[in-house]
Amino acid sequence: MRRLWSVIAATLLVAVACQAPRSTASTTAPAAASSSAAPNFAGRTLNIVTGGTGGVYIIYGAGLADVLSKKLKVAASAQSTPASVDNMKLIRDGKADLAFTLADTAFDAINGKGRFAPPEAKVDAKTIAVMYSNYMHIVAKAGSGINTVADLKGKRVSIGAAGSGTETKGIRVLEAYGLDATKDIQPQRLNAQDSADALRDGKVDAFFFDGGLPTSAVSDLANSTAIKLIDQSDAIAKMNAKYGNFYFAAKIPKGTYKNDVDVVTAGVANLLVVPSSFDGALVKAILQTMFDSQADLALIHPEAKNLKLDTATQGSPIDFHPAAIEFYKSKGVWKQ
């Protein structure tokens, strides 16, 4: 735990400097001394946009920034954000180099749908890896009488931070159960940690958070408060029918958060994306470093154990960066 927080602190210290618009130097290829010279990325800056406190993105992103800084000699930092929706906007606006994002949010961003419908501008971005799966956590206090999504009607519910993928997906889950987030609940928009704190303190009745396993805010809450995780199995087909085939049944295993049974949630893939113009040589170097350092990343967060060559190309609804395709072809895993 001490190593984890030291990594996060070190990478976040320089993140503020990366919030200004990125220069083209960060995404265009450096001049080579000769055609045979190996790319040298020393001194290049990389701003990795992640998520909020208590979630997986910020932890994983901080670990990735640490690894890339050490192995590629770049100046990589992890910037805390509301998460997916804002991350795609930061890519679009030239303020980020790599972004963690949900697959459904990425699709909307590229195609000008949902939160990216006009007058919002589309995002020109490409996937470089499918990282791991997200699980929609819907959390209430045990014994509260909230046992189904329908029971949230009229309740105080945090549906995720404004600008997060949790917010978008949470609204869709509610909709699948016939609930309008603007009318049928008392919505609040808090990040994972603030949501967990608010539930513990009786300020909300339930909260949504879409994250990997384990999500630290939920783990910490479960250690002090008896919680109930809400099943969403009936939502998945309805969400896919309306929004696209992004969602799948994802089980939170028994015991993850002291839960007595497996809980079926609406799952979605997490992507690592870059601007379409991103330097191809650097894409390949980042991917090689990520896979070479998978064991180190897994020490930062267990979800990094799911970073695998044979699954990193599966489940992205947006195109892969050409250099990423070349990388995966060189490893014999590109099947598309």
PLM-predicted stretches and their roles:
Residues 132-146, 265-281:
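A bilobed periplasmic-binding-protein/Venus flytrap-type ligand-binding module shared by bacterial periplasmic
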Residues 118-131, 136, 254-264:
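A structural signal for short loop-to-beta-strand junctions that line the ligand-binding cleft
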Residues 43, 187, 194, 200-202, ...:
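An extracytoplasmic/periplasmic, membrane-proximal ligand-sensing/linker region
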Residues 1-44:
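Short, low-complexity disordered leader/linker segments with a strong preference
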Residues 60-66, 77-119, 193-198, 213-222:
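Pocket-flanking alpha-helical
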Residues 43, 55, 73, 83-86, ...:
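Extracytoplasmic
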Residues 100-117, 171, 175-178, 206-247:
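A ligand-binding cleft/hinge motif common to bilobed small-molecule-binding domains
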Residues 43-76, 133-201, 295, 310, ...:
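Bilobed "Venus flytrap"/periplasmic-binding protein-like clamshell domains
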